[in-house]
C-alpha cells in the first residue's frame, strides 16, 4: 500500500495500452521503476498515501484537498508532431509525411507559447546545421528562422489543425512549431526513426533571446520532493503552464503540465494530438530518485 491508489485518469477518450503517447509511456515507466525500487528497499508508505487508502476504503473516494477546485487544463490546444504541424520541418523522403517530426520539445514550447499568445513578432535570426548521429553520409541542410521578420498569427492557431484546415491556420501553427525547433537547435530524426530531439535546458535562453519572454529557469527534480511539488502547485495556481520533461529507458520525452485537481493529480498535455492527455501523479510512492525537469 505504499503506492497511491489512483495514479491517473482522463475525463475523455479511450485508453489503448498497446498504443500510448510517448509522454505517458515515460510516466508509466517511472511508476514501474518507483515500485520496483520500493519493493527492493522496503519503502514504507508515506502518511499521505496511507490516508488516501483509508479514504478509499471508507468512502470509495480518495481524500481531496477541499481548499481548491480543479484548475485547468490551461492549454486548450491538442497539437502534435506530424503532418500538418511539421509542414516547414526538413524534408524526409523516408517519412510517411515527407517531413521529419516537429519534436516533443518544440511541440511543448509551441503549446505554451500559444497559451500566452506572445510575442506578436520575434527577435533576431538563428541558423544552424542539425547534428545527425550515425547518418551514413546523410546530412541535413542548414535550417534558418528569421524570428524578427515573423509576425506570429495567434488568431489563426486553433486547438487542432487537420489536412483540410485553412492554409492560414496550417501555416501559422507550423511556422511556430518549426521556429521553436530552430530556437533550441533541434536534432531531427533520420531513417532509423529515433525521433526529433533537443535539450530542454536550452529553452530559457531561446525564449528570452528570440521570443521576448522574461527570464525563466530550468529546474531538476534532484531537490526535495516537497520543494518540487510546491513549485508545480504554485505555477498551476498562478495559471502558468509548466514545460515538463524526463528520461527513462524508452528515451527522453517533453510535454506540458497545465492543471491540477484537488487530489494533487496534475494535468499533462503530451503533445500527441490530445491522445492520453489527463490527470496523473508525478510520483507513485512519494519518493523520487529519477530525474525530470521543468
Language-model segments: which ranges?
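Low-complexity, Gly/Ser/Thr/Pro-rich intrinsically disordered linker/tail segments
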Residues: 286-294
